[in-house]
Amino acid sequence: EGYMNQSAGLAGPQHEIKNKLIELMGKDKTETFFAEWRKNHFTKRDVDSLAAWGFNSIRLPMHYNLMTLPIEDEPIAGENTWIEEGFTIIDNLLEWARPHNMYVILDMHAAPGGQGYNADISDYDSSKASLWESTANQNKLVALWKKIAERYKDNEWIGGYDLINETNWDLPGGTLLRQVFERITTAIREVDKNHIIYIEGNDYANNFTGLTPPWDDNMVYSFHKYWSTVNDDDLDWILPMRDQQNVPLWMGESGENSNTWYTRFISLLEKNDVGWAWWTIKKVGDIDSPFSVKLNPGYQKILDYWKGEGDKPTEEEAYAAMMKLADNLLIENCLYRKDIPDAMFRQTTTDDVIPYSEKQSIPGRIDLSDYDLGKNNFAYYDTTVSDNRENGEFSAWNSGWRYRNDGVDIEENNDLNNSNGKHIGFTNKGEWISYSVKVFQTGAYKAVARIASQETGGEFHLSLNDEDITTTQSITSTGGWTTFKNHSDINNIILDEGEHILKIHFDNDIPINISSIKFVRTGAASSVDFAAINGNTVSDEKSIELSFNQSVSSSSIESSKDDFSIVVNGLEKEINTISLSPNKQRKIIITLKENLLYSDEIVANYSGSSLKSNSGQELKSFSDLLINNTLQQRFVIPGKIEAEASKVKFGFGIEDTEDEGGGKNLGYTDAGDYADYLIYTNSSQPYSVDFRVAAQNGTGEIGLYIVDATGTREFEICTVETPKTDGWQTWTTVTANTKNIGKGIFTLRMKVLKGGFNLNWFEFKEPDSDGDGIKDSIDNCSDTPEGTAVDFTGCPIFTLPLDNNKVWVTSASCIGNTDGSIGLSV
């Protein structure tokens, strides 16, 4: 397929690639290249690698034209000329797989005529009849499968026959698809009654309309999955078919994503006892396959020419470039992405991290691109870790697109000073990366970071075994993103001998490029004063954690409470408790009486002599130590919540809204869909909630719930019916009143009780139960009658009892005089 060779949009289907190459270097040289490509693309060494990683089967994508001629090239119409090359490829693969006890599953990836509108996949040529438009093509496919079955009927390492890959064609009811499948099955069973037959649905294998019930007693239904978010219920659409039809399932194709996505999806498949295969073992210039084929300059020149951005290469230049590309297919010439097999096998069963190659040494240089192998949140944390195609477009999980397939963004550079030619970039606040290291001698160290940045103000710090060992480092511009310089101001780091986990943490959203950190021992640990290093918020959202450069004496903590002060947004807050951080020697936790918010500016101060290190040193006084606030964002209630801005969502679609203010809205609602939002309420009270909704056809219903810490128990606070508005973008506002919500932090769940509506936003307001314009929280007269004039406390300004007043009129003495009057008494 063209995208695998970087020619997508230029030459996608194989026949287009071949024609373009013939135009450049002639038919003979093109055929020589294709033969070399087939020879080098998958060899015994590839099979050995798959076996070593843990695979027990190989799905072989086949093009029919390596085994038989196209119908238009047959010397006698309706007959079949057999070509040995394709069968020899299968024979070789079976021979290589047998010592490893690996099965080979034969996949008809390109059927006669092509089986889908997506020509890149099946080599469909729209100027000719497709498989579905030609009985001759269908006959050839049936005959080919019978020929294959005759040849391999007795081979025990054939894992089965995947009859047609990823049909994507308009086939009403699946009728013709089933007819062709049944014809192939009948032909195979005439000669081979043993091997499994794999059946893929229409619409890229996932539409099984018309394909049930099964027509053979040794059949498997095969589905595919790409790009969409991996959720626990992703297989709920297909698992019932397995049970209802009593037919096994096989996930025959997936991939093209990040390591995180791979681990999650494979874990889900294994949990549900569904076998799987992966696409693909190697591609040109990509990071998401185990082997990356190097893109040579000559081939790049060909691509540039096809794009209209370069000169046409000569015939010899083109031939040399393509033969070099074919040579680069060999494993020994590829870039091996060891992180991918690790994600697909080891990481699906453990959260443990392991060194990328071997433990890096201190003293010495730590190359930051060689971080530990493991999952997101265990070996690293990155804000973007997979491509979920939520907006229908590709979204890169790795902005550098080099070296590894995680969310950690890696680029290449030409720096020759303390560098392996790679650096971390595109950093964001809260991200971190871990390294298994071995410290050879206890002592005081300095660190030198190799950094490039166009901007000033990027920040990072280091920790060892999750205890900070440096203050937050602020970076000044080096003059450019590729202008690397030493940042040498990292001193007085105390490290203990032994094996540890070193982490680099990025503390704000100003990006930096950083390639390495070199550690140099400067003296004994006793030469460094006992001092505070950093402070961070804690996930309980009421505490801060202070880090020190030495271990803290636990016996000195209790008496030190009065020596600390915590200031939030300029106001000192009451400290509740101070304690040693669990399982940590260099950290204490200060818990406050009140909650903290993600937007708070927090500083810590210390003045006294109470807190001591285990070596007996008194803590140096400090003031205005800025606390790194990493709390998750919460919506402050009362306030507005944009419906699409949830922490977790299930089942909704997101679309552009035509409502006032623009933005997005949630849509495609069905009963059971839900979205979770993190909220903070600043007082304990009920609220009124406005919901901005639209609906084309009928009414719906929304429920709001407070969810407990386990995420399993819900407490209803209100429900509201959504009206029919006669348009999906015809908006109106409906209101409901909630039960009392306590003060503090909560998870709010918005659940669809009855679907068929769009939701733009919902807004919590303090209620005004009597409708007098004064919020209940300050309304001293909460039940005033409608229309009563009230003051700012919500109480009536005055009242006039109907039976306790008198009005009288005295006329003027003469027309034109002004001595008349009106009187009022109560």
Go through each PLM region and give its residues.
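Extracellular glycoside hydrolase catalytic/binding regions
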Residues: 133, 139-283, 288-303
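Extracellular calcium-associated, cysteine-rich motifs in secreted modular proteins
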Residues: 767-803
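Short, surface-exposed alpha-helix to beta-strand junction/turn motifs within ectodomains of secreted
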Residues: 542-580, 607-612, 623-628
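Extracytoplasmic
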Residues: 343-529, 555, 583, 595-599, ...
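Proline- and Ser/Thr-rich low-complexity, intrinsically disordered segments
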Residues: 769, 796-826
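Aromatic-rich peripheral "rim/lid" segments of glycoside hydrolase catalytic domains that contact
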Residues: 264, 268-361
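Active-site mouth of glycoside hydrolases
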Residues: 1-196, 201-209
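Short coil/turn motif common to extracellular beta-sandwich-like domains
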Residues: 539-545, 686, 813-823
